[in-house]
A protein has these predicted regions:
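Basic, amphipathic alpha-helical/coil surface patches used to engage anionic, phosphate-bearing ligands
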Residues: 1-315
């Protein structure tokens, strides 16, 4: 049956990267060859970082960091260090492994078929089931999440991301016992160094017991980021922030359903298994070769190496 609001949806949603609807804010026609050359040379000079020569990937990182070369370098450093030191999120990234398969069975992650007028892409996630699983499921959830956005960064150029997290099917025990300050701190640190600008986060269908988690979350992020976090009891409220063409049909938008977007992402993650196991998405920093910061005597609590790991400002 055709939805009543289909007449208001004037963009046909397609999931191919080349078909994404973009605007003048899009950077697709800009090669940024000089900046990419500088990044390749810089990576070659960094003893602890992998020697990346994938120009399209580096270009997407540069665009994601607002065309700032030094910001991109800082981001790449943190990006690869996180992957080396936070094993629960970035250990063996096998799409057919038990941990990732469990996450795929329980959760959908999808990427909007269209971009906003500003060139932002919407990431939507929803749990399929609230079943209990052995171990720390949120670590598996986070591993799968970063595999999905790594895959998307490899294929698509965007100016930033907006996240919609549908909490309609949430495991109360997981949320209240596994979302610890340490888990949030590591998650936020990883997101800080990811080569995407975080525009907004929308939590919808939020259960009342989740308030304690959001209080912890907000206490760990700068006020600037707090202003980008929204909680909605009514899912349709996201339509006040994001245009319909970028919102799944089951949330009142014109894009494909969360299930369709999630299944597409899942299929692609499995299809790119070699890239996750042995290709660019498996690469990490060699922390034994990381230069020490001679200007600092501080010890990083997160990364565990001498010297103060420079923290990015999220903007």
């Amino acid at each position: 049956m055709q939805r009543d609001d289909d007449k208001n949806c004037n963009v046909t949603a397609t999931v191919g990267a080349d078909d994404l609807q973009t605007t003048d804010v899009d950077h697709k026609l800009q090669p940024y060859d000089e900046e990419v050359d500088k990044l390749i040379e810089w990576l070659r000079d960094m003893p602890h970082l992998p020697n990346i020569t994938d120009r399209a990937w580096l270009r997407n990182c540069f665009i994601g960091r607002k065309l700032r070369i030094e910001r991109t370098k800082e981001s790449l450093d943190g990006y690869f260090c996180c992957r080396s030191l936070i094993d629960e999120f970035f250990g063996v990234r096998d799409p057919l492994g038990d941990d990732v398969q469990t996450a795929m069975r329980k959760t959908w992650f999808g990427f909007s078929s269209n971009l906003t007028d500003e060139g932002y892409q919407v990431i939507v996630t929803r749990n399929l089931t609230d079943e209990d699983v052995p171990g720390r499921y949120l670590d598996q959830w986070t591993k799968y999440f970063y595999m999905c956005i790594d895959w998307n960064l490899k294929r698509q150029t965007v100016n930033g991301v907006i996240i919609i997290y549908d909490m309609a099917t949430t495991n109360k025990n997981e949320l209240l016992t596994q979302v610890t300050p340490n888990f949030l701190r590591k998650s936020l640190q990883c997101s800080t160094f990811f080569p995407y600008k975080l525009i907004q986060v929308h939590f919808i269908n939020v259960p009342s017991y989740a308030a304690v988690v959001f209080n912890i979350l907000k206490s760990l992020v700068p006020k600037k980021i707090q202003s980008r976090i929204f909680m909605h009891n009514n899912p349709s409220d996201v339509l006040q922030h994001i245009k319909k063409e970028c919102i799944p049909s089951d949330l009142g938008g014109c894009d494909k359903s969360i299930k369709e977007l999630g299944e597409l992402c899942k299929e692609n993650i499995v299809a790119e298994r070699e890239m996750f196991m042995n290709g660019i998405l498996s690469l990490k920093a060699d922390m034994d070769k990381k230069p020490k910061d001679t200007n600092s005597n501080e010890q990083s609590e997160l990364f565990g190496f001498d010297g103060n790991f420079k923290q990015l400002n999220i903007d």
